[in-house]
Amino acid sequence: MTLNRGGKMGLSVKRTSIISLESRMELDKKGVGVDLGGKKLKDLLENANKNNNKNNKTKCKDEELKSENISLEEIKSMHQYCLDELNWQGINSIKPPFDINSDGPNKIDALEKYESFQPGFLFRIFKFLEEKKKRELLKDIEIAEMKDKALFGDYEKISQLSLRVLNGDLDCYFQVIDEIRPFDRLLKLGSEVEIGTNDSGSMEVEFKVNSEKVIPKSRFNKEISGNDEEVEITYYEMIEEYVCSSILFVAKNIMNIIPVNKVVVHAVDNVVDIDKGAKNDITILSIVFDRETLNKLNIKTVNPIDALDYFICNMRHQKASGFKNVDRIVQY
């Protein structure tokens, strides 16, 4: 294990991207991932699942969240809101919706309606009504063909994307993260996330806690009773729980949507730097999550602080004064 002495800010990898609520990720124009034709990946996955094995399902929806409405209990329980895992092997094995050399389901249905049309009494008297109805049914066949073409096109997009993800295509990794937006829950609270990687087996994250924004002392003091010292200690404990819960949330969400085996998270916050004696943005936690160990944890019930003991981790937290600066783990 190699350390970055002093916990220098920024990621030590070649490919990075800042995740923002206001804008989409700036993907490398030379490698644009898979063209989804303006459609959302979530919608394509949900549509594909309707006609295939239920075991391949995914729930990518993120509940609406506003920091002023969320309780302090929820803030320290971020790890309980992880996305379901995307089974890329299962997605890649999804069968085509129909044989491309044959008529699709929509056209078959439209043709059946056209061929089974039997003019009634009025149609036989007023021939123009019969002709009008037949034109409508023929138009429905054309529309059905377009629907089938779009249906097969969606299948091809998902098939191509899943194959490239399984092959470790970094452009597609970033595209999936940009489309599914696994960190929005943290971003809505006021934290920030930057991701990066050098290879297809790992992802590195700088998690900017912004604790004073997420848990303002003014709000905390109103909701927590006790003397000043007790409230101060409880406040620092709350920040510790939020940070540990959030890094579990970050690592688990990344591993749930892209097939990396390691996620390295560096948590940064504006706290007193003991080396400089003044408040500064410093690394307060650095941890290496491996997939095998993380998968063994019951993410819904685990104590996030205790969970860190299972991983290579640098963290210093004092009961009366909170987090202290630590060295970053840069080789893992």
Label every PLM stretch briefly.
Residues 2-19, 23-28, 33-332:
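Long, charge-dense low-complexity segments
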